[in-house]
Every structure is written in structure tokens, then in C-alpha cells.
């Protein structure tokens, strides 16, 4: 290859010729004289100008001269820099031309070597590369099949995740509805408790009223018993007084029978007198006693009648109130029993709803845990598959690059061996072949090592 490059370089000759640049600079003294002459001429011209105008023109001329001088210096510096860079470039190109001429001469003097071992080596490497490519293609097919299966599994897992999420949403809605229903039941239970408390307060008030009525009835009965005893005592007293009066009558009758014969006083009847006086006294006593007994009897009868009437009216009223209170108590007891039964039923319902809510929460937690596990497993599988796919694609790209470099190298060697190359661009092909040889051999070596 080097000999071919030398032969190609012989057909080309360097057309770059060395160039010489001469920079002439005037002497400062001559420049000063020229400036002096220009100044003298300008002085002769300006001598006819007034002093103020001359001063203005001289200051503007000095400013223009300084500006032109600075501009010329910058231009000269730029030209010097460009010249120095151009000279360096010319020296570099001359050295490169000499180097290329030396390489061309070395390639001309080099003998043609046998390229058959190189061809065999590259064909062997190419066969190995093709074998590796076929193996990787088969493994790629297996990996693609496995990837398709995993993608199907991922799709099924996604559908399962969607199903679990929908079920979780349904469970959440059901839990929310049960929570709302439970709140309604708790509110109703609280209202029932308040109603039961108010009914218990009313029942306590009615009990107090009933106790007061019963106490009043007991007092009235005690008063009735007292009045009855007093009436009986008065009856007994009246009976006693009546018997006493009868006794006194009998006694008087007996006294009349047993009295001695009255002394007859002439002109005066003492028996009739005492009899009439005694009868008069007895009548007065009987009248006074009867009046007193009648008054006592009337008073007792009136008092007893009024008390009896009061007791009767009070008993009727108390009986009606007592009956009404008993009916109200029975009604309240029935309502309390109904509320207690409803409270027990609501407590049972709340307990069952809480148990159902706990069960649904547990099922939801299990489903969420399974969903998280499935997600983690899915993410791990996807990460593993992506890493595996990335490595397979990298190996495939590596092998494709190696294959392309080997094909280019083989094409170059075929052209060299078959003698179809032209002199124009031969050195470029040789350099490309040398570069791709090293790159292709290194890539093929890495691919074989990684596949093995």
C-alpha cells in the first residue's frame, strides 16, 4: 500500500513555489525632510492667513495628521501580522510537501508484498463476524419473542391494574356512602337519645306530680278519718247525752213516785209548785240541751258534708288526673320501649355497617398492596427489559458498525487485489483502509468477547 502511495505521489509534483517578499521602509530623516518641506510649503501658504484662522487650521491639521499616523500604524501592523502568518503557512506546506515526497520515494522503493495472508485473515475475521451476527440475530429473535410476551404480560397487568383501580374507586364510593349513612344513623340516634332524655325528664316530672297527688290523697284520707272519728265521737256523745237525759227522766219519774206525801200547807200546793218548777227546769234543760245538740249536729253534718263533697270532688279530680297520668306514663313507656328497640336495632345496624366498612377497608388495603406489588414488579420487569433491549441494541449497532467497516475494508482490498484501482485517490483509500482495519478489528474483537 505504501508503494502504491509512492507511485501515486510520483505522478503529482508540488506546484507550490517559495515566495520572497521585500518590504522597503523610508528613512526617518527623509520622512522628516518631506514633512518639513510640506510644512514649509504650508507655512508659506498660511502666512497670508489671519492669526485666529491659522491657529484653528494648525490644530485641525495636527489632529488630522495624528489620526492618519495612527491609522497607518494599525494598517502596517495588520499587514505585518498577515505576512508573518502567511510565511508560517508557507513553511508548513513546504515541510509537508517534503514529507510527502519522502513517503512517495519510500513507497516507490518498497517491494510488492503478498496480500494473500491478509486476505485470509480478514476473510476469517469476516466469517467469524458473520457467525456472531447470525447468533446475535437468532438471540435477537428470541429476545424479540420474549419481549413480545412480556409486552403482552405488561398489557394484561395494565388491564388488571385498571380493573383493580376501578374496584378500588367503587369500594371508596361504597365506603363514602356507608360513612354518610352511618353519619345519618348517628344523627338520628342522637336525636332519639335527646328525645328519650326529654321523655325521661317528663316522666320524672309526672312521677313527682303523682307523688304529690298521692301525698295529698293521703292527707285528705287522714283528714277524712279524723273527721269521721270526730263525727262518730259526736254521735257517741249525743247518744250518751240522750241516754243521760232518759236516765234523768226516769230518775225524775221515780222521784215523783217515791217522793213523800207533801206537806199540806193551807192555802198553798207545794207539790204542784215543785212539780211545775221541776218540769219547767227539765224542759229548759232539755230545750238547751236539744238546741246545743242540734247545733253540734248541724255543724258536724255541714262540716262533714262539705268535707265529703270536697273529698268527692278532689277524689274525682285526682282520679282523673291520676288516670290521665297513668295513661301518659303508659304511653311514654310504650314510646320508650319502641325507642329502645329502635336504638338497639340501630346499634346492631351500625355495628354491622362498621364491620362491613372495616372489611371493605381491609379488602381495599389488600388490593392496594397487591396493586403496589404488581406496579413494582411491572416497573422492575420493564426496567430489566429496557436495559436488556438497550444492551442488545448497543451490541447490534456495534456489530453493524464492525460489519460496515469490514465491508469497506474488504472492498478496498478487493480493489487493490484485482488491480482496478486508479492512481487518483489511491492514497486516500489506503489510509481509509488502514484506519478501518484498526477500528474494525477492535470492534470485532470487542463484539466477540462480549458475545462469548
Swiss-Prot record:
Residue ranges annotated for the IF rod domain, each copy included: 72-424
Biased composition annotated in UniProt, kind: Low complexity: 33-50
Region annotated Linker 1, chain positions: 112-121
Keywords: Coiled coil, Intermediate filament, Sulfation
Gene3D superfamilies with a match to the protein in the record: 1.20.5.170, Vasodilator-stimulated phosphoprotein (1.20.5.1160)
Composition bias type Basic and acidic residues, residue spans: 1-13
Modified residues (Sulfoserine): 156
Family label: Belongs to the intermediate filament family.
Name of the protein this chain belongs to: Retrograde protein of 51 kDa
Organism the protein comes from: Lymnaea stagnalis
The gene coding this protein: RGP51
Amino acid at each position: 500500500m505504501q508503494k502504491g502511495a509512492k507511485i501515486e505521489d510520483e505522478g503529482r509534483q508540488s506546484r507550490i513555489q517559495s515566495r520572497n517578499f521585500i518590504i522597503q521602509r523610508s528613512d526617518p530623516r527623509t520622512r522628516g525632510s518631506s514633512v518639513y518641506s510640506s510644512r514649509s510649503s504650508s507655512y508659506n501658504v498660511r502666512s497670508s492667513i489671519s492669526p485666529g484662522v491659522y491657529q484653528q487650521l494648525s490644530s485641525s491639521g495636527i489632529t488630522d495628521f495624528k489620526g492618519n499616523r495612527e491609522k497607518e500604524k494599525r494598517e502596517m501592523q495588520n499587514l505585518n501580522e498577515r505576512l508573518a502568518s502567511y510565511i508560517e503557512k508557507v513553511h508548513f506546506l513546504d515541510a509537508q510537501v517534503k514529507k510527502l515526497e519522502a513517503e512517495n520515494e519510500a513507497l516507490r522503493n518498497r517491494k510488492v508484498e503478498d496480500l494473500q495472508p491478509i486476505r485470509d485473515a480478514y476473510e476469517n475475521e469476516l466469517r467469524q463476524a458473520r457467525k456472531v451476527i447470525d447468533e446475535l440475530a437468532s438471540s435477537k429473535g428470541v429476545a424479540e419473542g420474549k419481549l413480545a410476551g412480556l409486552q403482552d404480560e405488561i398489557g394484561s397487568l395494565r388491564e388488571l391494574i385498571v380493573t383493580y383501580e376501578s374496584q378500588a374507586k367503587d369500594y371508596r364510593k361504597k365506603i363514602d356512602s356507608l360513612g354518610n349513612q352511618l353519619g345519618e344513623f348517628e344523627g338520628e340516634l342522637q336525636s332519639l337519645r335527646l328525645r328519650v332524655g326529654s321523655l325521661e325528664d317528663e316522666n320524672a316530672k309526672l312521677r313527682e306530680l303523682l307523688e304529690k297527688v298521692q301525698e295529698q290523697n293521703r292527707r285528705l284520707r287522714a283528714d277524712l278519718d279524723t273527721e269521721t272519728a270526730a263525727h262518730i265521737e259526736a254521735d257517741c256523745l249525743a247518744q250518751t247525752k240522750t241516754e243521760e237525759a232518759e236516765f234523768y227522766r226516769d230518775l225524775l219519774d221515780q222521784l215523783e213516785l217515791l217522793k213523800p206525801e207533801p206537806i199540806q200547807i193551807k192555802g198553798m200546793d207545794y207539790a204542784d209548785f215543785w212539780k211545775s218548777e221541776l218540769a219547767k227546769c227539765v224542759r229548759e234543760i232539755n230545750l238547751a240541751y236539744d238546741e246545743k245538740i242540734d247545733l253540734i249536729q248541724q255543724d258536724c253534718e255541714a262540716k262533714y258534708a262539705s268535707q265529703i263533697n270536697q273529698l268527692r270532688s278532689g277524689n274525682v279530680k285526682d282520679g282523673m288526673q291520676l288516670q290521665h297520668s297513668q295513661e301518659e306514663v303508659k304511653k311514654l313507656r310504650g314510646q320508650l320501649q319502641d325507642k329502645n328497640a329502635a336504638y338497639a336495632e340501630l346499634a346492631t345496624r351500625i355495628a354491622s355497617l362498621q364491620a362491613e366498612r372495616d372489611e371493605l377497608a381491609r379488602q381495599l388495603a389488600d388490593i392496594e398492596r397487591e396493586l403496589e406489588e404488581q406496579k413494582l414488579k411491572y416497573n422492575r420487569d420493564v426496567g430489566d427489559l429496557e436495559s436488556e433491549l438497550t444492551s442488545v441494541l448497543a451490541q447490534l449497532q456495534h456489530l453493524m458498525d464492525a460489519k460496515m467497516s469490514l465491508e469497506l475494508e474488504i472492498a478496498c482490498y478487493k480493489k487493490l487485489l484485482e488491480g482496478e484501482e486508479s492512481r487518483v485517490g489511491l492514497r486516500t483509500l489506503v489510509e481509509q483502509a488502514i484506519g478501518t482495519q484498526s477500528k474494525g478489528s477492535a470492534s470485532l474483537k470487542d463484539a466477540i468477547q462480549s458475545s462469548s
